[in-house]
Amino acid sequence: MSAVNSPKPHPAPELGDMKESEFRRFGHELIDWIADYFENIDQLPVLPNMEPGDLKAQLPSVPPEHGESMENIIADVDRLIAPALTHWSHPSFFAYFATSTSGPGILGELLSAAFDNKSMLWRTSPASTELEEVVLDW
């Protein structure tokens, strides 16, 4: 195939469906939201004051035709989702088992989500496999 007929390289796609500048902005906003959540968690009720179906009644019965803005999604988390949670990291939550939430763990999950490695065997993720082998031998 000649160079004239060669497909032209496409620029790298944006990060998912979001521009990098938006990712940075909303990433910072969510980190701040999470930090505020943990800073003020002791002021929240451990258990939500609701009955089965209360949240469902506030959610749309059909999927949206178009995606919502991150501003609206974060507002929905703040207004609808967080108040409907059992707050396992609350200092007065003593049921089931101890929570394993930690700042370093959350940041580690963020890295894990960004790498999106499927660590099922060495070929799919040499770093994950070898790191796991070392840590398990400790």
Residue ranges of predicted features:
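N-terminal entrance/gating region of PLP-dependent enzymes' catalytic architecture
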Residues: 2-138
